[in-house]
Amino acid sequence: MRSESKKLECIILAAGFSSRLGEEKTLIGVGNRSLIGWVSKRISDRGVEPIVITRPDIIGEVTQSTEECRVLSNPYPERGRTGTIKIGISELDRSDSEGYRLMIVPVDRPGFSNSTLDLMMSSNKSCCPSKNGRGGHPLLLTEADINRVREAPSDAPLSSIVSPTKIEVKDPFLHLNVDTPEDLIELSKFLSFFEGNIEN
């Protein structure tokens, strides 16, 4: 049960570049918010205050978009996603001496449903949602896997460090990846679907 679980923490990854999209993906509009503001609110509405890791050149705009979230900068985002995660873990380690579970949410992979989000947040094992056998996001890590990330090189692919259990879900937009102008069309379709199925 949730009450028996270790405390849940969350890192939102927003340090990637947007060369293929042609505009800053983290800051694209989602209703009256930016994408990072919309994703972070989905997490904070469930009682978890996420840490956002972004790039130095957009940290001011990201901070303004995320209200009361802690926002940190990765000065070397080109070294890869694992290095960004390690920055967040180091920050969490300063205040969470008793250990924690960690949910990792890439800002450009927002197509998970609320039910999938709740499923990940309640898990006591390292896992990720899956559709048609292909893993998606968010990713939930246990203490043991968090420690593996701590000890790994910053440029190591996350897939070489942890092997989460895949949990099959029905989310039609689970594999949405906001990376190109064409993906913005899919993002719009997802938002329409999400607003029409807000409890799902």
Model-predicted segments: where are they?
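Conserved alpha/beta core of the MobA/IspD/sugar-nucleotide pyrophosphorylase nucleotidyltransferase superfamily
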Residues: 2-8, 147-200
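Conserved N-terminal catalytic core of the sugar/cofactor nucleotidyltransferase
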Residues: 2-3, 37-101
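N-terminal glycine-rich phosphate-binding loop and ensuing alpha1 helix
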Residues: 4-56
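Short beta-strand segments
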Residues: 13-15, 105-106, 129-130, 168-170
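Residues at secondary-structure transition points
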Residues: 22, 30-34, 57, 75-83, ...
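A residue-level structural signature of the nucleotidyltransferase/glycosyltransferase Rossmann-like core
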Residues: 51, 109, 137-140, 166, ...
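Conserved beta-loop-beta/alpha segment of the NTase-like Rossmann-fold superfamily
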Residues: 78-148
